[in-house]
Amino acid sequence: MKWQGKSARKPTGGRLVPARGKRKYELGREPAETLVGPIRVKKIRTRGGNQKLRLLKADVASVSDPVTGATKLVKIETVVDNPANRHYVRRNIITRGAVIRTEIGEARVLSRPGQDGVVNAVLLPKH
């Protein structure tokens, strides 16, 4: 668990005396960092007793072709580009906005795998 509350330090470096302690709603979690590999999903209990699916590994993506409007389930080969973090490319980490290479060409990921539990992407036009 990761606490996402206010810092105990001022911008000058001096200490702030907190008026209250930490609260449960200020807790966050570590990112899922979805990898390319055999599918692995983890269920997380979220606020209100709801559930969120963490996609830890994925080997297929639901890729939509904007020209024809058809959607296919295709195999993910590798991560080509990731604007979230340049080091995610060599580590093969899939996030929203990442460009992945699939069997039918390159596609941009539109879903959030760590939140939604699926990889949805749109096919990019060939240069």
Swiss-Prot record:
The gene is rps8e. One of its GO terms (biological process) is translation. Residues 1-24 are annotated as: Disordered. The keyword Ribosomal protein applies. Part of the 30S ribosomal subunit. CDD domains: Ribosomal_S8e (cd11382). It comes from the Archaea. It comes from Methanothrix thermoacetophila (strain DSM 6194 / JCM 14653 / NBRC 101360 / PT). It holds the Pfam family Ribosomal_S8e. This is Small ribosomal subunit protein eS8. GO terms for cellular component: ribonucleoprotein complex; ribosome. One of its GO terms (molecular function) is structural constituent of ribosome. InterPro entries: Ribosomal_eS8 (IPR001047), Ribosomal_eS8_CS (IPR018283), Ribosomal_protein_eS8_arc (IPR020919), Ribosomal_Se8/biogenesis_NSA2 (IPR022309). PANTHER family: 40S RIBOSOMAL PROTEIN S8. Belongs to the eukaryotic ribosomal protein eS8 family. NCBIfam families: eS8. Keywords: Ribonucleoprotein, Ribosomal protein.
